Amino acid sequence: VDVEACKSKGIAVGITPNGVRRPVAASVLTYILALSGRLMVKDALVRGGPSTFAERAQHMGTGLVGKTLGSIGLGNIGTEVFRLCAPLDMNFIAHDPYIDPTIAKSVNVELKDLESIFRESDFLTINVPLGEETRHLVNSARLTLMKPTAYLINTSRGPVVDQTALVTALTQGVIAGAGLDVFDPE
C-alpha cells in the first residue's frame, strides 16, 4: 500500500501487526516442517503413482533437532516464529539492528550480523517490512553465503528477495529450497 498516496487523498491506512502475527508465524513453521520433511517431493511421488522404496527413501527429509533457525527481523512476527519453534529444539539466531537485545534474549535468540545469519542458518526466515534498505536484501551475493543444504522462507514482502537471484540459486543448487507466499511483483 502506498501510504503517502493514501495520506495525500485523505484515505486512512491502518497497520495491524498483531492481527497477522500468529498466522504468519504459523505459516513459517509450516514451511519449516514441509521443507525439512521434503513434503512436496513426497506429494509428487504419491501423485505420480506407485514408487519403489528406494525412490521414497531418497526423500526421507531431515530432523530439526540441533539445526539453526535464522531470522532477518525480530519484530512481532519474528519473535512469534521463535516462540512457535521452541519445542523443535533448534538453535536460534537473528539479525535486527533495531531490536532491543532483551527481546532477543526473551525468546532465546542470539543476535548476529547479517552475513552470519546467511552463513549459519539451516532455515532462514525473512520477517522485515519493505523499504529502500530491505528491497532485494536477499540477493545473489547473500544467497551464495548460504549452505547448499539451507532453505529460505519469505513470508514478508516479495521485493525483499531478488527473485531472479533466487531462481538461479535454486537451479544451480546453491541452496536446497525455498518456501514463499509472497512474490515480486506482489
Which residues make up each language-model segment?
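An N-terminal-biased, well-structured beta-alpha scaffold segment characteristic
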Residues: 1-13, 139
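Rossmann-like dinucleotide/phosphate-binding beta-alpha-beta segment
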Residues: 57-148
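Rossmann-like dinucleotide-binding domain for NAD(H)/NADP(H)
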Residues: 14, 140, 149-186
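Short, small-residue-enriched loops and turns at beta-alpha junctions
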Residues: 22, 131-135, 159-160, 185-186
